[in-house]
């Protein structure tokens, strides 16, 4: 007889909401990475590409947890992408997405704690910690732009030109 772990329906709902956030973030960071690379801001683009991949790893962990509970990972619904049209807007859009994700993960971790689902709580707390690092990074970038100006900030991130076949 096979034992299937059934999860609290609200926990699975939180996991799917988190999955939606992460899937949206994958696409948003990837598109922003492509914009930055296209604008010649290759050093900055590398960071955004790495963030997109990290969001994919988050989505994978959430999917794994949903399946553990014999739930259905909903990958068909995304939130609207927040797309920046310039460097500062990209940072602001990504910061808004990260703040939204952090709030969801904080709420979800609290619910999971009350439901005595400590493993899922720990997953949400780990995701929240990662998002807080992203938030700190993005806020620092906006602070730099405010202090040194957008022109100097973008000049700092032009890189990868030597030997590039672009």
Predicted regions, residues:
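Iron-associated oxidoreductase/ferritin-like identity signal
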Residues: 1-166
């Amino acid at each position: 007889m096979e034992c299937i772990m059934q999860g609290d329906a609200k926990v699975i709902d939180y996991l799917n909401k988190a999955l939606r956030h992460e899937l949206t973030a994958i696409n948003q960071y990837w598109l922003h990475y492509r914009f930055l690379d296209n604008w010649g801001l290759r050093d900055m683009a590398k960071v955004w590409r790495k963030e997109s991949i990290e969001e994919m790893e988050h989505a994978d962990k959430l999917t794994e947890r949903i399946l553990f509970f014999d739930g259905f990972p909903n990958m068909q619904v995304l939130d609207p992408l927040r797309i920046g049209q310039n460097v500062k807007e990209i940072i602001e859009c990504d910061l808004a997405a990260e703040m939204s994700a952090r709030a969801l993960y904080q709420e979800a971790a609290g619910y999971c704690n009350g439901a005595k689902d400590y493993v899922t709580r720990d997953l949400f707390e780990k995701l929240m910690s990662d998002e807080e690092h992203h938030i700190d990074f993005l806020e620092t970038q906006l602070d730099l732009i405010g202090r040194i100006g957008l022109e100097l900030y973008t000049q700092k991130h032009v890189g990868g030109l030597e030997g590039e076949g672009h």
